[in-house]
């Protein structure tokens, strides 16, 4: 065991993680290799960015396309969603296409806000709606 009784565990807050990939969600998630010509990760309370990427770094076509993980914590789900949307919109990556526009669409969508998404939601409903915008 982990040495902690279940009744001693307290849930505090809510967190959302967004994996930022150098891919084009409008082109069947095709990789977007190139050079990062602008890099400005978001900041703020509850916002963390895990990445080794910097301005001028290359994104080769041969490896995993993930360039960053954005982790946002809020007081509750609603607060985490609002902070996540702000962080996604403030995240500046230039020179390559990324999945950030799709992340903003998903996190801001009423189905996500109301916790009505499933493992099939993006493929069946979310992506078709995103592509129409």
Model region roles, listed by residue range:
Residues 1-133:
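Catalytic cores of soluble metabolic enzymes centered on carboxylation/carboxyl-transfer
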């Amino acid at each position: 065991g982990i040495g902690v009784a279940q009744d001693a565990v307290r849930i505090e807050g809510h967190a959302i993680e967004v994996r930022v990939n150098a891919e084009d969600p409008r082109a069947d998630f095709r990789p977007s290799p190139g050079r990062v010509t602008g890099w400005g990760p978001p900041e703020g309370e509850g916002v963390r960015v895990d990445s080794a990427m910097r301005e001028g770094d290359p994104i080769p076509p041969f490896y995993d396309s993930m360039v960053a993980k954005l982790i946002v914590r809020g007081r509750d789900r609603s607060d985490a969603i609002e902070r996540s949307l702000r962080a996604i919109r403030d995240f500046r990556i230039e020179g390559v296409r990324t999945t950030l526009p799709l992340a903003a669409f998903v996190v801001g969508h009423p189905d996500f806000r109301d916790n009505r998404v499933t493992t099939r939601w993006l493929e069946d409903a979310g992506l078709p709606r995103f592509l129409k915008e």
